[in-house]
């Protein structure tokens, strides 16, 4: 949480008081509220990430801190294979594509993560959240497409890749790199799909529903 004008993180100070004093003062009832057997467990990003504020060192003196890095590529493939199997389970024409879909998503994510660094632009932050957003957007788009074909599906996956990864980029050169990298990854993994499927511009829209 952000600091107030006095440099205090009020929520963190409240938690520290409970840890140190074993309770807090209730100003409405003018009573001291005692707490017992209380544990606080939280997760946060490093303070070096954009928009983050370092936690109070006084509070951290009471808390063991464990650093958990992002999953490696093989772990990401295993995690998102499970999600994508559920995603495609109701689409008979797409059965058997979950492995290719997962490899394409993770490979494209990893290439972007390695190529675009936080030092270049503050929005160039890449985490597995991108893969989760990608998967959820595919789920939302496919709700009304029970008979989507493999070619249409790959084009939809490419559309969401462009929205998630390419639209945040600043320069034309970066956008070109992103587009070419996506084409390279998709054509090598979805080898059964014709190159014309990735021809731009790609925009999916539901005109009757007013969304896209």
Name each model-derived stretch.
Residues 1-45, 57, 83-84:
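Conserved catalytic/switch belt of AAA+ P-loop NTPases
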Residues 36-41, 61-64, 69-212:
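Alpha-helical lid/collar subdomain of P-loop NTPases
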Residues 2-3, 48-54, 74-78:
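Switch/connector loops and helix/strand junctions flanking conserved nucleotide-binding motifs
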